[in-house]
From Swiss-Prot:
Keywords: Autocatalytic cleavage, Decarboxylase, Lyase, Polyamine biosynthesis, Pyruvate, S-adenosyl-L-methionine, Schiff base, Spermidine biosynthesis, Zymogen. The lineage of its organism: Bacteria, Bacillati, Bacillota, Clostridia, Eubacteriales. It comes from Clostridium perfringens (strain SM101 / Type A). Heterooctamer of four alpha and four beta chains arranged as a tetramer of alpha/beta heterodimers. This is S-adenosylmethionine decarboxylase proenzyme. The gene is speD. Belongs to the prokaryotic AdoMetDC family. Type 2 subfamily.
Length: 271
């Protein structure tokens, strides 16, 4: 959980904006055109707007916020987007803008209590399937942004987000912007202790990944990259059994998947 060793008594509303940008990459080996098409269809169905909405609503609950409005869309030929407007405190229905749907979907209950509207607090998710006809490696990227103002922090949902997707490579950015004031009028540019994003990820999860930080502490910018250590071919072959392949083929495919992950992890073409 977030917090300072010594609590700061703030004057008025906490104006700090905390933004978490979370990108995961799922890698797959698909040799034939049919396998590529089937994988894209599978991913498109597996991570459609309905499921993504459920994930964002779970995140909203985990960080202690409340849904004001949801907009979602599935795209053709593939991809999906969801945007959720949230509030730190639940609003009485009479105070909610009539254009907001209050997240009234089949798996949500309408909450009606207390006050406080944070119109810059939101969650968004977009999906990006990617493949090339000359390449047997397919990737699928999920881009999630969680932006909050007030006391709530998006860092509390990191483990859930990592576990919600097949996360082979992960890039996470966290920044704090704006300032708030204490009761003496002194500006405060961050309201919690943080040395690394990794501090908010479960140790058992971190053991599965190689991780690296690039932080700019004086600017309240934190960046973590993670790459899965174990490449088990059964998790990367789509509709194929690795034991039906020769040892040389398995070695070659594992090597190609590893190179693809290293390039995505480093953000540069190497091989």
């Amino acid at each position: 959980m977030l917090g300072l060793k010594e609590k700061i008594c703030l004057y008025g509303f906490n104006n700090l904006t905390k933004t978490l940008s979370f990108n995961i990459y799922d890698i797959c080996y698909a040799k034939t055109e049919r396998e590529k098409e089937d994988y894209i269809k599978y991913i498109d169905e597996q991570y459609n707007s309905e499921r993504l909405t459920k994930i964002l609503c779970d995140v909203t609950e985990m960080i202690g916020a409340h849904v004001l409005n949801i907009s979602k869309q599935d795209y053709e030929p593939q991809g999906a987007s969801v945007n959720v407007l949230i509030t730190e405190e639940a609003l009485p229905v009479a105070l909610i803008d009539p254009s907001c749907n209050k997240g009234e979907l089949s798996y949500l209950e309408l909450r009606d209590s207390v006050v406080g509207h944070l119109d810059k607090s939101h969650l968004t998710v977009h999906t990006y399937p990617e493949f090339h006809p000359n390449n047997d490696i397919i990737s699928f990227r999920v881009d999630i942004d969680v932006s909050t103002c007030g006391k709530i922090s998006p860092l509390n949902a990191l483990d859930y987000l990592i576990g919600s997707f097949d996360s082979d490579v992960i890039t996470i950015d966290y920044r704090v912007r704006g300032f708030t004031r204490d009761v003496d009028g002194r500006k405060c540019y961050i309201d919690h202790d943080i040395k690394s994003i990794q501090d908010y990820i479960d140790e058992e999860t971190l053991k599965k990944y190689d991780a690296m930080d690039v932080n700019v502490y004086q600017s309240n910018i934190f960046h973590t990259k993670m790459m899965l250590k174990d490449i088990g071919l059964n998790n990367y072959l789509f509709n194929s059994d690795p034991y039906e392949l020769s040892p040389n083929d398995r070695r070659e495919i594992r090597d190609r998947i590893s190179k693809e992950m290293i390039e995505i992890y480093g953000g540069v073409n190497i091989y």
